[in-house]
Every structure is written in structure tokens, then in C-alpha cells.
Amino acid sequence: LTAFDGNLYRLRRRDVDLEAVRAAFPKRLSETGLFASTEELELLPGAVPYSVNVPLWSDHAEKERFIVLPAGAKIGFEEQASWRFPVGTVLVKHFLLDLDRQTASGEQRLETRFFVRSPEGWKGYTYVWNEAQTDADLLDEAMTRTYRVKTADGEIEQPWYFPSRADCMACHTRATDFVLGPNTRQMNRKLDPAGGDANQIGTFARLGMFENPPTRPVEELERYPDWEAGSGTTDALVRAYLDVNCSFCHSPAGIGGKRPDLRFHTPLKETAMVG
């Protein structure tokens, strides 16, 4: 095989039966063992909620995020590089769409995604919520649903694409070390943006979630500007947005090729965005 990095690669047969793994995965969200109640969206103790400084744009959807670590396992902390997650980690992302943007009273559960660190590597799974909003079913193939949404300009139809397992891995690639959200720049923020001063990374450290906690105060660690608060300079906000939303493809090792290079630390003159 040829690749964008100019190297040649050879395929190697995997020893694991992927079809057997797929068939064994729980078919309903309520069967995963992570929820005390899917109807109330109540996770069992051990699921740690988190938020990020720059959320990935998701067609007006709101998201709730959780980390679930296996018993006794810890995260390998890195200031700049990707965090290292142990086998058995489950990253949960729950998507909701407001069907009435004027009154914010029409919240609809769309899907709940699992990103699972298995012995064979990372795997993505999508659960699609039923009409009763009581449970969600494991998706086998990608599909699209259309929702009617009330806006200030009238009612519109909004399509929503539910990704297949292969779709998940189109963005969560080896070039990005697979995990896109939980890293130092994204997670270095208040645990509760609405109040309190506890830092999210500091809280994770106090909970014993890191095998190697930060050696410097969290105030000295790098962070993206808070996108929703609009903090930071325009340049920093734009570079953070492009890094989060685009650089997993548009970077030297990404599937979009070497140019443009939209990583956060690439000097502007080397990004190929201007000039």
C-alpha cells in the first residue's frame, strides 16, 4: 500500500475475529453495564463527566461527555502529546438536538457513542435512541434521519447522519493517536464552568486518575481559549477551532495531505492558509 507520507506498507492478517467481537457487543445501551437508568440517562458510579474548551462543531447538537476507566487503571498524562488510555477505557459522548431553538424546550436524544480501547485497539460504536427516548439500539450501518426544528426564521428540516463503525475511524486515526477530545489543551479548564474554581485536570489528579500526575501547577499548563466564553485573542480562537475541527485530516500525517497544516502550533506562514 502507498500512503500520503511517501512510505510503502504491507497488510498483515489480524488474529482476532472482528465479526465475533462485533456480534458480542451489547445491542442496547441499557445492556452495556454503564447505566443505572437509560431512561433517566443516569450512569453508574465511576463514569466521570468532563467538558472541553473547544467542542467539535456538530450541527447545533449539544454533547455530554464521560470517561470510564477499568478498575485500578489510570491515564498516562502528557502535557503536549496525546494522553495514554489503558485497555478497557470507554469514552462516552451523548448527543442531543434542540428541536425548538427559540425556547430551548425541545431537547431530543439523538445518539450515544462509545469509543472503546480494546486489546486490539480503539473501536467506535453508535447507539441510536428510540422514539420513546427510553433506550438506544446499536447501529450496524450508517443512516440518516431528518428532524423538524423550529427556528427564528420558521421551521426547517435538519438531517442527522449517524456514523457507522468505519466512519468513526475515518477521523479517529493513528495520525491523531485515535483520541481527539481528552488532552491537556482541551481539558485544562474549570470542572464546572457555571461556578466554582476547581480545575478539571487538577480534579482528575486528586481522584487518582493519572498514573503520572502533572508536575507543574495547572495554571502553567497550556490550554485552548474557552470557545463558548469567547475568551482569548481572535487568532488563538481561530487556530484552536481549526486544530480541533480540521487538523485530524489537514496535517502532515492526516488523510488530507500535508497542506494546509492546521495544527495549533504550526507557524502561520507554514500552514499554507495565507499568502
Task: Name the predicted role of every residue range.
Residues 1-20, 27, 102-275:
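Sequence context surrounding c-type heme c attachment/ligation sites in exported
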Residues 12-69:
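N-terminal pre-domain segments of enzymes
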Residues 75-80:
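Short alpha-helix capping/helix-loop boundary micro-motifs
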Residues 85-88:
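Short, well-ordered loop/turn sites that connect or cap secondary structure elements
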